[in-house]
């Protein structure tokens, strides 16, 4: 392996260092440190209000951070380092540079947020055309490919109101993939679905993980965490209480707060 290849392999996909986030006086994230290796699936679990979703939103700068650093592929998110007078200063990136960073990170939300006046295919085509200036014919070809990938090749011209919740969420995943992200973030993607529709979305996510996509997933689906996750992070009160191999954490949690949480959900 070449030196450059070794360096690339050693670079975490996501590196979070001493991350703090406040909402007013509420200290939501309290010094988070986290490494997400390339091609891995990191699953975040914990009670409501523990900071899981806020952490996700800080990774792609939907929320600004108050202290600490977030790097994706070794590149600071939202900031650049400037050497001045023997010390390193952090300066905010331009809006254009921040948008370019954000375009590399796909995110799927609890609510599908599809455009109701657009078909499934049009929803998937929209961002590549507007943001990446992809020719319409190429965006359409890619959109069809992605909708077929998530099992919706027969729903291209359906509007969101004509789709089930699970189908809408699969369109949302295809829409995120249309930007060719290097990292995918999922914020409780199945929590708004009827129980019988959860499996179809989890299957798409499992297939995506098998393809080598780096994923950070907030979920209450412990079966998914066990079967697909490479590392499991339990958060409570804005801190990481426990982390490790999903099977080990789920079957033999070491922290009392982890044990209490798992006993309430398993």
Predicted segments, located by residue:
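C-terminal boundary and immediately downstream tail of ABC-type ATPase nucleotide-binding domains
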Residues: 2, 234-237, 243, 247-266
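ABC family nucleotide-binding domain
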Residues: 9-246
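Short, low-complexity, intrinsically disordered N-terminal peptides in bacterial proteins
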Residues: 1-10
């Amino acid at each position: 392996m070449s030196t450059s290849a070794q360096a690339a392999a050693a670079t975490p996909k996501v590196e979070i260092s001493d991350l703090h986030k406040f909402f007013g006086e509420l200290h939501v994230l309290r010094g988070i440190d986290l490494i997400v290796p390339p091609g891995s699936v990191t699953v975040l679990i914990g009670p409501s209000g523990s900071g899981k979703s806020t952490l996700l939103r800080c990774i792609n700068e939907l929320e600004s951070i108050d202290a600490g650093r977030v790097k994706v592929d070794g590149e600071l998110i939202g900031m650049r380092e400037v050497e001045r007078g023997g010390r390193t200063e952090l300066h905010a990136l331009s809006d254009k540079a921040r948008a370019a960073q954000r375009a590399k990170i796909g995110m799927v939300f609890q609510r599908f947020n599809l455009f109701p006046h657009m078909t499934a295919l049009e929803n998937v085509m929209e961002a590549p055309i507007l943001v990446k200036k992809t020719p319409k014919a190429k965006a359409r070809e890619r959109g069809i490919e992605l909708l077929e990938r998530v099992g919706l090749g027969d729903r291209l011209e359906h509007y969101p109101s004509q789709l089930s919740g699970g189908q809408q969420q699969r369109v949302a995943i295809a829409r995120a993939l249309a930007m060719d992200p290097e990292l995918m973030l999922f914020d409780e993607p199945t929590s708004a679905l009827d129980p019988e529709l959860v499996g179809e979305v989890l299957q798409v996510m499992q297939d995506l993980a098998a393809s080598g996509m780096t994923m950070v997933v907030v979920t209450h689906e412990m079966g998914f965490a066990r079967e697909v996750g490479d590392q499991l992070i339990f958060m409570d009160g804005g801190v990481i209480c426990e982390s490790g191999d999903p099977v080990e954490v789920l079957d033999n949690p070491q922290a009392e707060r982890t044990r209490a949480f798992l006993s309430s959900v398993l």
